[in-house]
Amino acid sequence: MSMKYKTGMFGGSFDPLHTGHIHDIIRAAAMCRELYVVISWCRGRESTSKEMRYRWILNSTRHLSNVMIRMVEDQALTKEEYDTPGYWEQGARDIKAVIGKPIDAVFCGTDYLGTGRFEALYGPESQVIYFDRSEVPVCSTDIRAWALGHWDYIPSVCRDYYARHVLVLGSESTGKSTLVRNLALAYNTNYVSEAGRDTC
């Protein structure tokens, strides 16, 4: 299959990764011989570690042989500090350096459409392609605020990070098994039976 672009870039903090990101990565990968997914990170601003986000993206895109993941660090401790022209300009320089070759296509969401930001940072050598975020209407901010309320948008590879685990300990014949079953029913989840019940 002939790809429209030789080298593409899709960047973000992916903090956390959600199905909208995966949707856009798959679309971008279908258009490029090589797609670089660039994770922006800064120690102190992260809600999930850069290593965790790297693993999530790697495990979600492992089947896409043309997807490469890179990381770029910045020093902005807040989102407001990061969202300034100086940080974006430095970020673009860092991204170009880590990719190390001309970038034909830059992919981003329609929330940036009309700002001219990506065109100024990557043009004219890069075409900026906007993906409509309304196709998968979620953002990382929503998930950070209430993960369980946006559970359907959290990829399966990320869900264990958000799942709550409860361990019930106690002497035998005190009602642990019944309690665990009732909790699982009440919270619409699963449970693991006591090992001793089946093996002893």
Stretch-by-stretch model annotation:
Residues 179, 183:
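Hydrophobic positions on the alpha1 helix immediately C-terminal to the Walker A/P-loop
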Residues 185-200:
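Conserved substrate/cofactor phosphate-moiety recognition/catalytic segment
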Residues 176:
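Conserved lysine of the Walker
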Residues 2-165:
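Nucleotidyltransferase catalytic core that binds NTPs
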Residues 172:
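The conserved Walker
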Residues 168:
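Hydrophobic anchor at the beta1->P-loop junction of P-loop NTPases
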